[in-house]
Amino acid sequence: MGLLIFWPGMMSHDSIIQWNQLSQNRYSNLQPVFHTLFMKSITMIWDSPGAVCLVQILMLGTLLGFFLKELESLGIKKKYIWLSSALIAINPINIVLSITLWKDILYTILVLWCCLMFLKIGKIKTQFYSKTYNIILLPIVFVLPYLVRWNGLFILIGCFFFLYLLFPDKRRINAT
C-alpha cells in the first residue's frame, strides 16, 4: 500500500545520483557500485524506481517470513508469531523504509539474513555444515553487506569472528 501511495518510491539525493549512474551506464564507487548494479539488474526487466522498491518489499517480506518460521520451529507460539508479523507489517517505519531507494535498505535486509543464518546455526549446530548448500551460502551471505555498504566490513569480520567463537572444537580443518 505504501508503494502505491508514494509511487514510484522515495528517493534522496544519493538515490538520484545512483539512478543517473544506472541510467547512463556510468558508474562511480562513491556509492558502492554493487548496489547500483543491483538496481540496474532489476531495471533491465522494468525500468522504474518502483521495480526496485517492489523487489525490496518482496525480499524483506520473504526474509522476515523465513525468520518467523525459524522462530516458530524453536517453539515460539503461533499467536506471538502472528502478532510479530502484524506489527512488522503495519509499522510506519517499515512501510516507508521498504519503499525508499537507499543502499541502507538492502544492507538491512542482508544483515537480517546474516542473523537468520546464525539463528539456523544455533538451532542445528554442526549439522548446519553437513549440507553443501549451507557451506556455499554462508560466506556469500556474510560478504554481501560489505558489498552494499563500506561499513559492512564490520559485519563481515564480526560474523566470521562469531563463528570462530561458536565452534571452538571445529577450528581446525582436516585436509583428509
What kind of region is each of these model predictions?
Residues 5-18, 26-38, 42, 46-50:
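Extracytoplasmic catalytic/substrate-binding loops of multi-pass membrane glycan-assembly enzymes
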